[in-house]
Amino acid sequence: MQNTYFVIIGSNDRLLYEYPKESAMKYASDNEYVLNQFVILSALDFIEEKKKTTPKMYFKSIDVYGSHHLSAFVTSGNIKFVLMSTSKTDDTKGFFTAVYEDYVKIILNPFYELQTPIESEGLNTHIKQLLKQYKLE
């Protein structure tokens, strides 16, 4: 399984963005991509439960799957950022905050239609840099 997998899920639980893209990932098996998505989607239930009990936007640890830790950030518009990583760094909040700033810039673009998949090479590059900066990759 990949060391790091990051997704942005829309308020309607549709996948808006993923890093790395399926085509860029190297898998040990064909089912690995599906397993990554399954783990992330099952974590959405945990996120919804935690969101009901607390007004927090950042959830440091929502689930553990094998050696992977899942963290989440939920915007006020109910957009969910979910990170699955083997890294044990404590600064995932900084990563989510930086990605949130990028997300806000994207949705403020008049050519972007809300709740549609995000196709941005600039975002891919910046997320790759952020993952290295926060030692998550």
Residue ranges and their predicted role:
Residues 1-5, 11-137:
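Acidic, low-complexity cytosolic segments
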